[in-house]
Amino acid sequence: MLETFPIHMTSFKQDRQIRVYLPKGYNHGKKKYPVLYMHDGQNVFNDEDAIGGTSLELEKYLDERGLEVIVVGIDLNTEDRLNEYCPWVNGEYSRKIIGQLQTSGGKGKEYVEFIVNELKPFIDKNYRTIKDHTAMAGISLGGLISVYAMCRYPHIFRNIAVFSSAFFRNQEEIEKLIKESDLSLVETIYLDSGDKESGNKEMINKEFLHSNKVIYDLLKEKVPRTEFEIISGAEHSYAFFRERAPMIFSFLNE
């Protein structure tokens, strides 16, 4: 069952659509459930709402398997996604991959604070949640902001799963943050990356993969249950992301 509603984002002075998946048995008991927060909400649950027409199809996947988890999808702002999902302004590593210096980014801190201070309290108040069993998952820039959220709030986001993360946008800063963060409360981290993220652009493929490997190495030092997979032939598109969606739940539920 999927519910949708707008919620006000104080820092951004705007409303944002929220999509909440409730497991099949939710309305037939008083059981409490763990919660998974995901970004790019339009692309999480079904193709009908997906911006590019292809989603992760999680509503169908979760219903078919009867998984007992509440999933909260936060809609993306199509005009400001890069700014909201990047905690810092894009740096030199980003320029190296893209080929030009960009000044996007820098609103990620406020976006994560919205999740922690406004959205999560609302979800915990209005749904039967296990408040201290909270995970986060994201794709591309959603992966970057998920790892940032974990570093800033490791006591909240103890389980993280990210696909094809665009760490390169804030490579220098996210490396520094990981090194400085106490992640002793974090339980599990799953990362992956395709080896053809940019199709036939081999230089970008190489740098993108290297970016993810560096982050994996840093996280593995701090969180023993950190896993990284290189997906052969996988490109940066939802056709490939959808195939890996089950990994979110198989890893987080171990």
Feature-to-residue mapping (PLM):
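Non-catalytic cap/lid and distal C-terminal segments of serine-dependent acyl enzymes
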Residues: 1-254
